[in-house]
Amino acid sequence: MPVVDIDPDELRRLTGHRSKDDDELRQDLFGLGIEYEGETEDGDFKLEFEADRLDRLSVEGIARSLRYHAGDDRGVDIPDTNAPEWAIDVTDVPADRPYVTGAVIRGVDLDADALDSLIQLQEKLHATMGRKRAKGAIGIHDLAMLKGDTVDGDGTAARSLTYTGIDPDGDTFVPLDDDAERTPADVLTEHPTGETYADLLADHDTYPAIYDDIGLFSFPPVINGRRTEVTTDSRELFVELTGTDQWTIDRMCAIICYALDARGATIEDVTVDYPDRELHRPDFAVRTKHVSHDRIETLLGVEFTTEAVVDLAERAGLDATPTDDGYDVEIPPYRVDVRHPVDVVDDLGRAYDFNDLTPRYPDVNTIGGRTESSRLERSVRQALVGLGFEDLLNFNMTSEAENFDRMRLTPDHDAVGAAQPATIAEPYSQDFTILRTWALPSLAMVLETNTHHAYPQDLAEVGFAAHADGDTQTGVAERRTVAAVLARNDASYEDAKARLQALCDEFAVALETPPTTHPSFIDGRAATIEIDGQPAGVIGELHPGVIVEHDVEVPVAGFEFELDALR
């Protein structure tokens, strides 16, 4: 759970609730689901809150939530933006960090508290949504220190910066907290911040860089140049974000802009010129979620009028437009946590105040117990642990690259794991765009992230896999699967077969393994798993191409089959 340090006096000033004492503030924060964890030596509140409410990573975001909670603000608030005077020209960027966004901030009053809050928000976003800068990184610069080409435009941006890829040993700049000119490669080996984030650019032939007329001033995702350092004297800022996913960096940018808007700053658009399209950023577009009236009443257990729901939505910082069966609810751009209609209902419940809801027992009399399938799954997990495997639980969502490409597989192959995947609508991340069709790729990814640990590594998972199926009500067919890998110097088909045979003996089923071919396994070292005479999965030694793709340093053998075959 994220923890932030908040100055209570600054919180009072931003909310306008100057007369409230610390106890009253703590009570208001508790009403938002924000836990008070104590105070720092300087008297700041240490606050812990839900990991999904990234808009509350700063005092400005918490103040906004308190103002809505108190009824001071209502509905979706979209900041006004001025026409762009700056552009970012995107050319020859590294393929693994192709996206950029930004904003110009004018008229900001950065005293020491405001600057500390901005830096804390930047670093908290890096640690959470930015995945420690791997997915998204923020650079904040003093705009007065930037020099851009001035061109005669037709109402479009007139000053241009360049986001590009450069030679690691090419141009030099003076990084923050330094006084020496260094190349990007030097920064990664000679600067403390560079050493911290060097792994993000390991084995890269080109590094990301942002230039103005003077030269290199930003080396994302590592560090900014000292020339554009932001101080309490800065009144105009340039905010740039780079990353692996446009949606993610756009949402991070929106959170930064809303925080500065709360301090009275003016936001100005930036034109992002990709080779194939032009974007105007920041992106303050609202999203819309439809939620039925019945769902609201069922989940909250309260009967509402249409007018009451619209009022609750406005008090929650949303806007609800009635429809025939419910409401189209507009979501502000900083609310990255609202992904489902249930999230909207949760907001409505908080606006209503959960303390005013009357708990009641369900109108059923049942005696709980494990289902047959749950008992089987538990027994298989215990058996795998007894056979020396580490029991894992991975995400059911993945990407086509992980599920197919890195396993040398395509959806059209006639092989275990090959199937048309169920795709995710409006994916939160390009890392999670489909439901996995098999579990072995998930175990391969775990091996990839644990190459720094000693071998052998014997891993197993009992989980779910799925594929698209138009004949089902949901369009998805789901099944439970058992997968295991053995990573060690002497891993072989025979080792995997021995473990699988022991597992089948435990459940009193007959195992046969006729030879087969599979793109993910070595030819001649793979077999079909037949249990009680029925094909159920595949076993073998992973193909060297798969092993190299995942940077695993030892041979790997593994198997996967359908759990229900053990019934």
Curated annotation (Swiss-Prot):
Cofactor(s) of this protein: Mg(2+)
Q: Which GO terms describe its cellular component?
A: phenylalanine-tRNA ligase complex
- B5 domain residues are 284-359
Record SMART domains: B3_4, B5
Please tell me where Mg(2+) binds in this chain: 337, 343, 346-347
Keyword annotations for this protein, in alphabetical order, are: Aminoacyl-tRNA synthetase, ATP-binding, Cytoplasm, Ligase, Magnesium, Metal-binding, Nucleotide-binding, Protein biosynthesis
> Coiled-coil annotation: which residues?
none
Which InterPro entries is this protein grouped with? aa-tRNA-synth_II/BPL/LPL, B3/B4_tRNA-bd, DNA-bd_dom_put_sf, Phe-tRNA-ligase_IIc_bsu, Phe-tRNA-synth_IIc_bsu_arc_euk, Phe-tRNA_synthase-like_B3/B4, Phe_tRNA_ligase_beta2_arc, PheRS_beta_core
Tell me the compartments it is located in.
Answer: Cytoplasm
Superkingdom in the source lineage: Archaea
Q: What class of enzyme is it?
A: ligase
Entry's EC annotation: 6.1.1.20
- Pfam annotation, one family: B5
Q: Which reaction does it catalyse?
A: tRNA(Phe) + L-phenylalanine + ATP = L-phenylalanyl-tRNA(Phe) + AMP + diphosphate + H(+)
Q: Name one GO biological process term.
A: phenylalanyl-tRNA aminoacylation
Molecular function terms, GO-annotated: ATP binding; magnesium ion binding; phenylalanine-tRNA ligase activity; RNA binding
PANTHER family linked: PHENYLALANINE--TRNA LIGASE BETA SUBUNIT, PHENYLALANYL-TRNA SYNTHETASE BETA CHAIN AND LEUCINE-RICH REPEAT-CONTAINING PROTEIN 47
Q: How does it assemble?
A: Tetramer of two alpha and two beta subunits.
Q: Which HAMAP family match?
A: Phe_tRNA_synth_beta2
**Family per UniProt?**
Belongs to the phenylalanyl-tRNA synthetase beta subunit family. Type 2 subfamily.
- Name of protein: Phenylalanine--tRNA ligase beta subunit
